[in-house]
Amino acid sequence: MRKYVLYLALLAGLLTGCYNEEDSREHVLKVYNWADYIGEGVLEDFQQYYKEQTGEEIRIVYQTFDINEIMLTKIEKGHEDFDVVCPSEYIIERMLRKDLLLPIDTVFAHSPNYMNGVAPYIREQIDKLGTPDNPASRYAVCYMWGTAGLLYNRAYVSESDLKSWGCLWDKRFAGKILMKDAYRDAYGMALLYARRRDLAEGRVTVPELMNDYSPASMDSVEKYLKLLKPNVAGWEADFGKEMMTKGKAWMNMTWSGDAQWAIEEARTVGVSWPIPFPKKAATSGMTDG
């Protein structure tokens, strides 16, 4: 699970490609999603719902990914013709610029248009990914929302150690930290720490830094990530929560959904999640659609 569930919606992206299996392509729904994002039984329920609405049967081909950039590369190269995908907001923005998406069909059988019920704030956040003439809400709506922060084991780390992202560079934690293998999260965390004084003095904002890919900023990120290397036990996309529950790592820069899973599974080893992370250290919220 990548993030904590706060909102429910859908992104519909019909991509070009070929389909060579026996089923007629129009009766196959191909979904590309994060692991743990759809509960057991939902796919079967949807097949039944679809038949009730249309009188036709549909087969679902469901695949998962754990890194946004891998998902995007697979789609860009035309290896698959997915109907529904669930990338993070910055990938939605790229896909829209590259004309990889089609507008959501809001007229389906006897179903109401649920997009009319999307909260104005959420629609506004999605539309920021597009342009006034081509708002992203035509192509995407929010499905998951969450943050990145630090999961820690209280047997080895105290909450007072976690005043800022600087704790990740503390030599006491050499070889005991797991980092999320997600480019944007690692990049953003390192840049927020590198520019912490500018943030504190109001010369720059978190959203500005999270989208700053200037040569100077990339150099700063490279410098701080290299300095972090001695403390990193590994880079993980999904196994970090399990290593934390087993006490094999002391800290994990992770997504709030993974952290919540670990808390529920491993209270006996003292895993704790500081929510919210101190404002001066927190990354901006993340949205998957």
Residue positions per predicted region:
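Ligand-binding pocket segment of bilobal, Venus flytrap-like solute-binding proteins
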Residues: M179, A186, A190, D198-P274
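Short helix-loop capping/hinge motifs at secondary-structure junctions, enriched
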Residues: Y156-K163, R195-G202
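A bilobed periplasmic-binding-protein/Venus flytrap-type ligand-binding module shared by bacterial periplasmic
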Residues: G149-Y156, L192, T287-G289
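C-terminal motif of bacterial Sec signal peptides marking the signal peptidase cleavage site
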Residues: L14-G17
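Extracytoplasmic/periplasmic substrate-recognition and gating elements
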Residues: A266-G289
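Short loop->beta-strand "edge-of-pocket" segments that line small-molecule binding or catalytic clefts
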Residues: C167-D185
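Hinge/lid segment of periplasmic solute-binding proteins
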Residues: L72, E93-W145, E159-K163
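Early extracytoplasmic/lumenal segment of secretory-pathway proteins
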Residues: Y19-K98
